[in-house]
Amino acid sequence: MKELKKHYQRAFLALIKAYKRYYLGVWIIKLPFYKLTSNQHKITKWQAKRDERLEFLHNALKTFKFLRTFDEESKKWLNSPEFKAKYLDTKHPYPPLLNPDSVDYKCIPAELAWEINLPLPPNYDFIYFVVWGCASRSTLTYFSQEGLRLSPFCSDLPTIEQYKLTFDFLKNSTIKIKKILLIHSYTSNFIGEKYLYLVVKNVPVFIVVRDPISIVKTWANHTHPNPNKINKFNLTFDYHQVLDCIVYDSGKNPNMDNEGVYLASQSCSFAQKKYLPYFTKNPKIIIDASDLSVDNAYRTMQNLGKKLNFTLTLPKKDYVNKSNTSTFHNLFPFILICHSGDLTKMFKGGFEQRNMKSLEYKNSIKIIITDGIRGNAWRRNRDYTQLNGIESQQILFFISQKNAQKLYSDKSLFESTKEYLQGFIKALNKRIALESKNQLAEKDILEYFAKNKAQRQKYKTIFDENLSFYKELCPDIVESWKYYNEFEKMCAELDKSKERQNERI
């Protein structure tokens, strides 16, 4: 193989580097000094560093030995009856040049693994087929908060780079931690036939589905980041102005005439026909997005845990405030700066006396304002705690432990901050009500389709092409989709009406 020589040279250089780091590093002479000063913390760090470098050396040696014997092992495998039966006779388009069942994945660089068609390391417990608009953000949050590891994904990466990223994640992961292989259903940036052929482990495929009219509604109401959003503000800012930053993909208000709604639906939510044929042999676990609502999420996750062999560690209350909508996807987080110098000009719902100075003060107190979905990262951060005395169904407030003591000890500033945040919460509720009033509902989408034949036919085509899988795998769920069934009925009636008109002519 042309590239094999390059990999061999790299492995040789990596081995020399690992040897030098372990045996000749300056860090070795530090141990006697640490022992002399009885610095146990430094000794522990030294030991951990030594173990890390020893493991690096062992892996470098394994890789070097593996590449030396690559040609011989590959020839044995390619001439074996097992290879013939499994790959040649079945005309597999990407046969591996080494036996995946006997190879040591830790010895193989990800780039070489791709070149020799090696399947992804079978170090994952199930596959989550991510369909945007089907509670995917909430689902990923639920899995993550329960300690399950999610394989990395970046939609902008070329297929080979995504493979390398996933390969390294899986080969370096510990066996004890449950891991999920994520397959994102994009058509605009299709992950590629070869990548999907290299996902071979026969584990369950988990899918969340949703009424397609509701998915279209999500894209019609979808927002994007506002470059003019005020991310950091203080007690003098008018919170109504701070919250007036929602920008829809269609402009100031949702609009089904925007071609972006169709393109987003097609490329991010209706790509089943491109992906699911590669997983026909895998068992499927399919639920409806409604099962992951705030009221149902905890019970649903318990049931999934039984089927996918993981145990919930968090109480039911931690599944509250996790609902996500595309409307507020780009609204949070905010940073509120609290400083006693702003109290005389604090905004109380009337005239604003904005003061920008405290935004740059080093001794100011910062409060993170975020939603339930993003709140998990702050919950896990031991340096932060939730702010006392403020409750909201929509948002969470986090403050560093150090700043919390500082704020609570300043009674005047603390009470004023609570008053300001109560006003912020009321303004947020008003903004939510206003945006909800402006947004399109499923009935609006159906009315639009009834009046626009060309658009109706475009959407029906992608529905028919992709939903056939669900009609076969979970017909009961498809039958429960109120708006989709109304859409199908409407299309049939309008088509019949058109046929009658043509017959009269």
Residues of each region from the PLM?
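PAPS-dependent sulfotransferase catalytic domain
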Residues: 4-54, 58-64, 69-75, 80, 191-404, 468, ...
